[in-house]
Structures are given as C-alpha cells and as structure tokens.
Regions:
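Hydrophobic alpha-helical membrane segments
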Residues: 1-235
C-alpha cells in the first residue's frame, strides 16, 4: 500500500483522494484513532461542558474557537503518520507527536492566525470567511513539512489550494457533513444505551472520535497530493 500510495501522489482526483484516505483510515484505524484521541477527548468533554454551562461566553469559547485552535494538532500528526507510510515506515503515536511538538509553537500560531483571519472574514462578510477557511486548508501541513511560519505558511497554503480550490472545498464539505450524518444514529443508539448522567460524556467522546481516523486521513492525502502536484508543476 505504501508504494502504491506514494506512486499515485500528484495524480489523484477528488474521488481518489477520498478513497485513498478511507482506505488508509481503515487499514491504520486503531493507530490513527490513538493519535486523534489526544485532541478528540478534551474537545468532546469541552463540548459537553459548554452545553451544560449557563455562561454563553464560556459555551462559545469551548466550541468553535477551541476546536479551530487545537484540532489541527491531530491533523498534522496524521500527516506525519501518512508520510511515514509512504516511506515504508510503520506510523506510531510517538513518532507523529515528536514531530508535531518540535513545531508546536508554529502550529498553534498558524492555527490562531487562521482562526482570526476566518473570523474577521465572516464578520466582514460570510464569503471572505469561507474563502479564507478553504485557502488555509494546507497551512498546518506546510508548517510541519516545509518549516514555514505565520503569514508565509498561509501564503504557501493558498499557493497549493488555488489551482484546485473547488476540489478542496468539495472535500472539506464532505469531511464536515458526512460524519455528522452518520453520527446521528450512532448518537441515538448510545444515548438510549448509556442514558444520561455520565453516559453523556462517553457518548460525546465516541461520537466525536469514531470518524477522526478517516477524516484526518482524507485531509492528509489531499494535502500531500496537492503538494506533489505543486512540485511536479515546478511552482
């Protein structure tokens, strides 16, 4: 699979990126799940705390801003894991996060820059916010694999996304919408089985975490394919 995947990078269409991501997510599911849980567990618990909180301000900050700020940590870790796979190296939690934490400050700074840019764009007008959201889809991968920071990383992300903007938008919508649709019946079953009380916390973790290996793998394949396309074009 590693040589097959590496050989196809730079030549994948939307369906192939999604298919390859799903295949990698399925094959390395437990490993990718372990990598993503380091972020998914606190985000799931924060979401429940936000829902239970009587403070609208606290609920807000435990929602989208927190997700946007720390979610990219797992996204980058899966990119590292898949790069290892393409090189014929077994992906591990330790290896993925050793690379991430070596660039941790730059990753968080890029997340904050992206979050602020999108928020400002949404406040000005919804369309600019959506544009910046898609333009920055490769920013985390660029920070770790190309050692760029801040604005330079954002510009490089746009350079990768620009030729395939609509493809990136399509994949973004796919990974945002599909897990939510599939999680609805899972959440219903878990709620009926576990009930309220402490069951709410367990349900939140499972509901958030089960799809992460597939979502992050698809986004990682998309980034690596766009990066390979860019190199092949000589940009």
């Amino acid at each position: 699979m590693s040589s097959e995947f590496a050989g196809k990078l730079g030549n994948l269409g939307i369906n192939e990126q999604i298919n390859m991501g799903l295949r990698l997510g399925a094959r390395y599911y437990l490993g990718f799940l372990l990598i993503s849980l380091i972020v998914d567990i606190p985000l799931a618990l924060a979401g429940v705390m936000g829902d239970k909180s009587s403070s609208s301000i606290l609920s807000f900050f435990l929602g989208i801003p927190l997700i946007a700020l720390i979610n990219p940590i797992s996204k980058v870790a899966i990119i590292i894991a898949i790069i290892d796979i393409t090189n014929g190296v077994k992906p591990t939690f330790r290896r993925a996060y050793s690379v991430v934490f070596s660039r941790f400050g730059a990753v968080i700074a890029a997340s904050a820059l992206w979050l602020i840019s999108v928020a400002v764009g949404v406040l000005v007008l919804v369309i600019p916010g959506l544009f910046l959201l898609i333009a920055g889809q490769c920013i985390m991968g660029v920070v770790v694999t190309e050692n760029l920071k801040g604005v330079a990383a954002f510009r490089r992300s746009w350079e990768l996304v620009k030729p395939k903007f609509w493809s990136v938008l399509t994949i973004f919508l796919f990974v945002e919408i599909t897990p939510g649709l599939l999680s609805a019946p899972i959440s219903l079953l878990l709620s009926n089985f576990l009930g309220g009380g402490n069951g709410v916390w367990i349900t939140a973790i499972i509901e958030r975490a089960w799809s992460s290996p597939f979502v992050y793998a698809i986004l990682a394949v998309m980034f690596l394919d766009l990066q390979a396309k860019n190199k092949e074009s000589g940009s």
